[in-house]
Amino acid sequence: MCIRDRKKSEGLCVVSFSWIFAIILASIPYLFFGISPVDALFEATSGITATGSTILTHFNYPNTVFFWRSFTQWLGGMGIIVLFIAILPQFAIAGRQMFFAEAPGPTEDKFTPRIKNTAAALWKVYAGLTIIEIAFLKINGMSGFEAVCNSLSSISGGGLSPNSQSMIGCSYPLLWITAFFMFFAGVSFNLQYKAWVKLNPLVLFRNEEFRTYFSAIFLIGILLSISLFFNMHYDLAGSITHSFFNVSTLVSSTGFCSVDYTKWDYTSKLLLFAIMLFGSCASSAGGGLKVMRWLLVFKIIKTEMTKILHPKAVCNIKTGSYSVPKEILDQTLMFVAFYFVILGVSAFLIAVLEQNTTIGLTGAVSAVGNIGPGFGAIGPLGSFAPLNALTKLILIFDMLIGRLELIPILVLFQKDFWVLKR
């Protein structure tokens, strides 16, 4: 194994074991409140990976428990490893390789020359948005404690709320404020930083991935609003508000809810399930397959169709002005295939264990995509507590590999990874 490969392996190894260690540490406080070890591990994994699934069946715990849940999500949203690099300069083992492993999804570039500067810049945007959201929620009538917890949860793409009803019953202004910040939780923080530096929001719309992300939310939001208006008989304001709130929460993998959408009609639930698979932008706090990968997959399909019609055509696949190398395209196809294999296997195992295909399918999608709630018994007002212990362990594994984008965890199971050749 060459020096470069070994450094990359070190980065992957440190990332994986740091997350596992962080999850174990995060689970300890739950044990003091009578929560079983498996459930404590599940809740901690859900927090650190910013998934938002919960095993809590009541909310009679002290506020410290709910703050801890929200804080673990906030740390996990951008990535504990990036935080370490930003505040612990002496932690310099394979720094760039760790950022490569941690940054979610394929990225266009590293926008500052030093990795520590990059991490610090990302955290300035992340912390700044959090503080702004807390202020807006408090000004619009939310209690100070809930404003802090919900802001930590929404900007991280987590979704664990101190309120058993999530955000059901909140005023429309509170829902729109939260939806706005959830939307940006799913936007590349690299891109947001550039927009802040240039004081020009139009920078966002020059990015192809952002335009696709924005368009998908707008399109699904409009279709869902129409469905709610005609099929569920919401008024116009209610249909638009609940539509865009719940689309934003699922596409950014946050997991809040403004209503129990499991009671919606089939068409509305199908639209929500579609946006669950879509995912957020690369280098965002959100989860899912990532918009950039969908873009590349569709461009690959379009290119192959062109080659069928014009065999001698020379086709380059680009994102913006960047020509994507074949190696990245191959990796993207491999990742997408592997992603759906993991989803399929997990859904099958969970469906068999729970004897419920809805729990199996939506549970796997929500765990690997770090979304949080699914449909049925594990919907936004449900709990994962009644599930089989083995099901919870499968979901824990899914949440972790989903947050680390499959490869850093799965590569640990390769024998060659542990063999250091000269």
Model-derived segments and spans:
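Membrane-proximal intracellular helices of multi-pass ion channels
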Residues: 4-422
